[in-house]
Curated annotation (Swiss-Prot):
This is Phosphoribosylformylglycinamidine synthase subunit PurL. It comes from Pyrobaculum arsenaticum (strain DSM 13514 / JCM 11321 / PZ6). The gene is purL. The keyword Ligase applies. InterPro entries: PRibForGlyAmidine_synth_PurL, PurL_linker, PurM-like_C_dom, PurM-like_C_sf, PurM-like_N, PurM-like_N_sf. Part of the phosphoribosylformylglycinamidine synthase complex involved in the purines biosynthetic pathway. Catalyzes the ATP-dependent conversion of formylglycinamide ribonucleotide (FGAR) and glutamine to yield formylglycinamidine ribonucleotide (FGAM) and glutamate. The FGAM synthase complex is composed of three subunits. PurQ produces an ammonia molecule by converting glutamine to glutamate. PurL transfers the ammonia molecule to FGAR to form FGAM in an ATP-dependent manner. Keywords: ATP-binding, Cytoplasm, Ligase, Magnesium, Metal-binding, Nucleotide-binding, Purine biosynthesis. One of its GO terms (cellular component) is cytoplasm. Pathway: Purine metabolism; IMP biosynthesis via de novo pathway; 5-amino-1-(5-phospho-D-ribosyl)imidazole from N(2)-formyl-N(1)-(5-phospho-D-ribosyl)glycinamide: step 1/2. The lineage of its organism: Archaea, Thermoproteota, Thermoprotei, Thermoproteales, Thermoproteaceae. One of its GO terms (molecular function) is ATP binding.
Length: 697
């Protein structure tokens, strides 16, 4: 992507001369929207990121959250939307590889991956091609590097037919003493390790900073190529290298241009790099290409001269190619050489920060919810339960090796969130879940973002975790569209409100702009991943009940069907406002589940598809039916369709001999029966539900 005229003027003023070709390459990469956040960082600074347990927040490759004395968890989210649109297999695989390397920068061992995937309808050939290859790319890479894919969220909507949203989150664990210490000083060396530089991924950050069009398949060269074997070597290398090195940085988006500029800025020093010294797979590359190359499976290590031999011995042990390409100096400049000649010399202050861009904003009102007739309930239940957005996602998660590493205590499909055992501290575990709802975010971006936050928070709580931290990913169209930029700003405000009200800091995130195809932007997609702590993973709750259990509903059901799956599937409408948020009620769910945790068989939150979907999912997961009187649910309305399909927040279903909230039924038999008093509304065998709710991919 070309620099704007205004940006070129800033560069020329800062340098006092026109930039060289190599300097232009540096600015094109590092000042791209993908790397610089020039249109968004002024808003992202508003997000709360501090708490006593947050050791390191946003601003570096990976945060650190202390979950037990001396034990840190790190987690980070990344988008790979544009690459996955044109080469879904490599786009998704390299997205997973990149987020794993972010986690490695703090010396952590990656223990889990989550994916938030948004595709077009599966009956569309192109959308199906993207979906199947994205899933294959994630599966192949995660399985081969030995990091389990333990959960996530999948959504289907026409907006994502040509512009998928592919988000990967990696979770890692590290002891306090194994985090690289920092303390970088002049004379320290810069070592690049991993695959040799080549032209794959060249211009990838610029590619991710423009809209997709029909000719975007010509951008295949901007998509990096994954190499999970080298990725696995880097994982193993880092576990031993932390004793040799001062700092680790992922060599990803923006290539060496971004890595050098960020390292110099972070440590308040200058850097001098000999670009011709880097090991290359393609010897035809010139200095500008080497600087901008986004070849995958590479890390930058900062090491003292005394520590170099220690690092080199490990690199040779793991057969990882490497180059000593530069050093830190006092100059406060990024100085680039090629075969002994200076080809770039830029002040760090100029290279580090692209000028901020604040775009015009224009709000809009969502379509109002019209008066609609109440449909036949049994047909409505069938339509909602057969929706791909409600369906059981076994067709996706069965392709992932979610048991590798033997930490996964609650597996995909078993509960509202993934639960992982941390062998470093007995039965201590972490609970993690990601959520997004593009319909909500389109209708009301602020409320939609808050809904994503509370849904992920509630999923963690209902599984038995105490939420501790969150990361987010905001995915929208071009910021040059006033309505789109308004969507982004409103989403930030919704996240800020939720994080402050719930007391959960946002320790990292990702913004992806220009998610459009032709002239059509996607529905804004605001994903939130919440991580919590559970003191004993053996008491984690799955979305199950046993024969004879009472079925209980905690929370109040309102007539909140705006943006719901019911309105879309049954009435073909995307209208109204998303459900309201009661933060106090969400926090009470944490307390309630903690109080009942040891006495319940299982629990499940009520979300997309409403109470009907929650009950059906528990029946399918358990292999046991239930007889439920939905009219016993606390509510202030009389419409049965709204009672069954409302997506009101602050609710969960629990099962056990006793339970929280109101008893609405009893589990047992091989059929799920929904009724109102003595009137049967819906009845289906558990096997029939499995067939109805299966996702065909």
């Amino acid at each position: 992507m070309a620099l704007s005229r205004e940006e070129l003027e800033v560069i020329e003023r800062g340098l006092g001369r026109p930039p060289s070709e190599v300097e232009l390459a540096l600015f094109r990469s590092h000042w791209s929207e993908h790397c610089s956040y020039k249109s968004t960082r002024m808003w992202l600074r508003r997000l709360p990121s501090r708490a006593p347990w947050v050791v390191r927040g946003p601003g570096t490759d990976a945060p650190l959250v202390e979950i037990a004395e001396g034990l840190f968890v790190t987690f980070k989210i990344e988008s790979h939307n544009h690459p996955s649109a044109v080469d879904p297999y490599n786009g998704a695989a390299t997205g997973v590889g990149g987020i794993i390397r972010d986690i490695l920068t703090v010396g952590a061992r990656p223990v889990a991956l989550l994916v938030n995937l948004h595709f077009g309808p599966l009956d569309h050939p192109h959308a199906r091609w993207i979906a199947s290859n994205v899933v294959r790319g994630i599966s192949d890479y995660g399985n081969r590097v030995g990091v389990p894919v333990v959960g996530g969220e999948t959504w289907f909507d026409e907006d994502f037919t040509y512009t998928p949203i592919v988000l990967a989150t990696c979770v890692g664990v590290v002891e306090k003493g194994k985090v690289p210490p920092g303390g970088v000083e002049t004379g320290d060396l810069i070592v690049v390790a991993g695959l040799g530089a080549d032209k794959s991924g060249l211009g990838g950050s610029a590619f991710a900073s423009k809209t997709l069009r029909e000719e975007s398949e010509e951008d295949l060269g901007a998509v990096q190529v994954a190499d999970p074997l080298m990725g696995k070597k880097l994982i193993d290398l880092v576990q031993e290298a932390v004793g040799c090195v001062k700092f680790i940085k992922d060599l990803g988006g923006g290539g060496l241009a971004t890595a050098l500029a960020e390292l110099a800025e972070w440590f308040g020093l200058g850097v001098e790099a000999e670009l011709d010294k880097i090991h290359m797979s393609d010897r035809e590359m010139g200095p500008a290409e080497v600087l901008s190359s986004e070849t995958q499976e590479r890390l930058v290590f900062v090491v003292s001269p005394q520590g170099l031999e220690c690092l080199k011995s490990l690199l040779e042990k793991y057969e990882v190619p490497y180059s000593v390409v530069g050093r830190f100096v006092k100059s406060g400049r990024v100085r680039l050489l090629w075969r002994g000649e200076v080809v770039g010399d830029v002040p760090v202050w100029l290279a580090a920060k692209a000028p901020e861009m604040v775009w015009p904003r224009e709000s809009y009102e969502p379509p109002p919810l019209p008066e609609i007739p109440e449909p036949p309930i049994d047909k409505a239940v069938e339509l909602v339960l057969s929706s791909p957005n409600v369906a059981v996602k076994e067709a996706i998660y069965r392709r992932f090796d979610f048991d590798v590493g033997v930490r996964t205590a609650v597996k995909p499909g078993e509960g509202d969130a993934a639960v992982l055992k941390l062998y470093e501290r007995g039965n201590l575990g972490i609970v993690v879940k990601g959520d997004a709802n593009p319909r909500y975010a389109y209708l009301d971006p602020r409320l939609g973002a808050a809904n994503a936050f509370v849904k992920a928070y509630r999923n963690v709580a209902v599984a038995g975790g105490v939420p501790k931290a969150a990361v987010d990913s905001i995915n929208v169209g071009s910021p040059a569209r006033p309505a789109v930029y308004w969507q982004f700003v409103e989403a930030v405000e919704g996240l800020k409100e939720a994080a402050e009200a719930l007391g959960v800091p946002i320790v990292g995130g990702k913004v992806s702009l220009y998610n459009e195809y032709g002239d059509r932007p996607i529905k804004p997609t605001v994903a939130v991943v919440v991580l919590g702590v559970i003191d004993d993973v053996s008491t984690a709750l799955r979305a199950l009940w046993r024969d004879g259990d009472g079925v209980y509903l905690w929370g109040f059901t309102r007539g909140e069907v705006g943006g719901s799956e019911y309105m879309y599937r049954v009435h073909r409408l995307v209208a109204g406002r998303p459900p309201s948020v009661d933060y106090a009620a969400e926090k009470r769910i944490v307390e309630e589940v903690q109080r009942w945790r040891g006495r319940l068989t299982g629990a499940k939150d009520v979300g997309v598809g409403g109470l009907a979907a929650a009950l059906a999912k528990m029946a399918v997961a358990s292999g046991v039916g239930a007889d439920v009187d939905v009219c016993k649910a606390p509510t202030d309305m009389g419409r049965l369709d709204y009672l069954l399909f409302s997506e009101s927040n602050g609710r969960f279903v629990a099962a056990g001999e006793e339970g929280p909230g109101v008893k609405i039924g009893v589990a047992g038999g091989d059929r799920l029966v929904l009724r109102c008093g003595s009137t049967q509304l819906f009845s289906r065998s558990v096997d029939g539900l499995k067939e109805l709710m299966s996702l065909g991919l």
